[in-house]
């Protein structure tokens, strides 16, 4: 059972996921390979923006920029209570985890949008982490 605040977070996360998949799928359907290129670049830009903002917030708080602080200090979004992972390692240099339940992946599956989900995961995370780490 989820709290009212958690339910709001769940609705926000699902709404964002649905918006991304509908937009990305339509762009790719309309423009083909060029559309996929556009979606990938836009997703990387979003990742870089979030990474840059999180980096600046941590610098403003005098937090050392490393993997531990990226995943352990002042998250930029509320955590989705449905998300489950085995965190295998989190140090200043390395993060290793195994995702058990990803609510975004469940939405992509439900909407038949695995391609959009794959693009998001391939492009967003790397761009976000690199921008956070190196600015």
Model-derived segments and spans:
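N-terminal accessory segment detector
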Residues: 1-124, 131-134
